[in-house]
């Protein structure tokens, strides 16, 4: 496919997507879909991707909007009020719950340590195509410092998970089951960030084993966070189910991490 054909295809599916949200969902969902597309293309891809080491940090905002778009879609008949700037802001930000914004912030804070773990051992490939990633520009020490900061922020954010639900009382059992599950899942992921050793021997495929593990765990971590949010929304039994699933995945990963494994290229 030529560059022009790819551009045309991207424009067409973007327009179709926005129109679909406008006709089948509501104006607010269409607005955030439009915002996501324009921010990703103009701010991230055209401006930041090849000019700043903070490219994925700022650009990560576009990738963090799907929960907001989905929540607005599920909310039903939402419309944008343009009578004043205040009315406009209220109409696009007030989705009836803090949870979509909690999930947006979760993805936003997760993005840097997720991608930088990969970039720690793929920085030469990023450099070869002119993408300035943090490890290649600022070095491993600076990258690991910032990754650890984001990991700590994610643990702090986990403490707010029950409050983001909106209908959980801190005296209820579900509040503590869900809250502690979120905290433990975040500590588990944060630990994989803190134990990354850029000086350890690389595998035959060029991986830094601890960085590779953190990268792969980060994907399981994000999925688990969404799973426990969904299960907890179903009540105490759902929160317990989410806790059991999280514990199973964590124990499985810790068990596998202690076993010798064959090197598979990434």
Per-range role (PLM):
Residues 1, 8, 12, 35, ...:
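Hydrophobic residues within alpha-helical transmembrane segments
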Residues 179-186, 219, 237-251:
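Small-residue-rich transmembrane alpha-helices that serve as helix-helix interface/gating elements
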Residues 16-31, 66-107, 159-177, 230-238:
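Helix-coil boundary and interhelical linker segments in multi-pass alpha-helical membrane proteins
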Residues 38-45, 104-123, 155, 183-198, ...:
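Transmembrane alpha-helical segments that form the membrane-embedded catalytic/substrate-channel core
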Residues 1-30, 140-167:
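Multi-pass membrane catalytic core of lipid/isoprenoid biosynthesis enzymes
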Residues 3-78:
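Intramembrane alpha-helical segments
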